[in-house]
């Protein structure tokens, strides 16, 4: 068992932080900062990237940090590092690293750069139930979070679809939500490459046109009826809807739920299954409470809603340069 060399001599630390930054985040806001010193990596929330309209309590922000943490820990196994994780109630994450040859590499580390949010219409093919059950089992942990799957055509699939429609009605009637969303849309290649964050025209399936052409079109599309028509087509093309719930609803829980989410997304990626978020019912408080009643999960908190299925790969979201989201301290 050996401690790490100083980070200036150890490229593994850069590899670990890079893997962490490949995690998903709301509007691809990348709300994290990494401080690397000797044998530890500290992940802190960057509240300048918060989304107050859609995520006022920072619930999804901390889940994004959990996703980043999971990537880091999985990548560490590939490099034969043992990780010890410490969480504070404020959401500061410290990962202690020890080089150990007895660490078993996780196969999920290899698919971290392949994971993507696929917002396209899927091909309608169903995921075999035994396969999906095995994928859920592979992702599960003992933190109290649970994964529920609802097959297309089932009554609860329809219930959740309706909840998404209701979520769109609420969010698209909120000017603050729409303005926040617009502020994170990157309308063409030039715009996207100037920021390396946000929702690019490419991931939204739009052509690369001048901003003066695309921006008015996007603004005009931010209406509940148009969004519902688009989402309904995408949901109906999917195989299943997946709901992740937790026993508690605090910062530590959100981080751990993010870890489970990322692990499940990587398990799906490894199996060639696409995914995209349907988080509207989890983001609107009254709909979140309604989900608890409709699904008979009164003692659990809905955290993440996904649709999954089969689809062709799509464009990847940009990421900030590592130098912008990290600091490497010398010994």
What is the predicted role of each segment?
Residues 1-331:
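Acidic, surface-exposed loops and disordered segments
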């Amino acid at each position: 068992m050996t401690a790490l060399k100083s980070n200036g001599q150890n490229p593994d630390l850069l590899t670990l932080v890079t893997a962490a930054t490949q995690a998903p985040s709301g509007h691809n806001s990348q709300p994290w900062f990494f401080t690397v010193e000797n044998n530890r990596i500290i992940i802190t929330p960057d509240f300048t990237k918060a989304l107050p309209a859609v995520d006022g309590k920072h619930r999804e922000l901390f889940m994004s940090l959990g996703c980043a943490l999971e990537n880091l820990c999985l990548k560490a196994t590939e490099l034969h590092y043992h990780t010890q994780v410490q969480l504070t109630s404020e959401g500061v994450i410290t990962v202690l690293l020890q080089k150990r040859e007895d660490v078993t590499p996780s196969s999920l580390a290899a698919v971290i750069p392949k994971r993507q949010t696929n917002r396209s219409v899927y091909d309608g093919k169903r995921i075999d139930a035994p396969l999906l059950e095995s994928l859920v089992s592979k992702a599960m942990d003992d933190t109290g979070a649970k994964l529920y799957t609802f097959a297309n055509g089932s009554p609860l699939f329809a219930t959740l679809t309706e909840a998404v429609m209701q979520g769109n009605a609420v969010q698209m009637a909120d000017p603050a939500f729409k303005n926040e969303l617009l502020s994170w849309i990157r309308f063409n290649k030039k715009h996207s490459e100037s920021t390396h964050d946000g929702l690019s025209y490419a991931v939204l399936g739009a052509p690369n046109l001048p901003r003066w052409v695309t921006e008015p079109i996007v603004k005009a599309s931010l209406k509940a009826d148009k969004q519902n028509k688009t989402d309904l087509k995408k949901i109906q093309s999917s195989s299943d809807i997946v709901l992740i719930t937790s026993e508690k609803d605090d910062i530590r829980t959100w981080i751990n739920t993010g870890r489970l989410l990322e692990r499940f997304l990587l398990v799906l990626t490894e199996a060639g299954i696409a995914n995209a978020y349907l988080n509207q019912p989890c983001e609107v408080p009254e709909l979140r409470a309604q989900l608890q009643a409709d699904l008979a999960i009164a003692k659990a908190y809905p955290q993440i809603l996904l649709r999954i299925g089969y689809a062709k790969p799509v464009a990847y979201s940009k990421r900030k340069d590592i130098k912008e989201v990290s600091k490497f301290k010398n010994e």
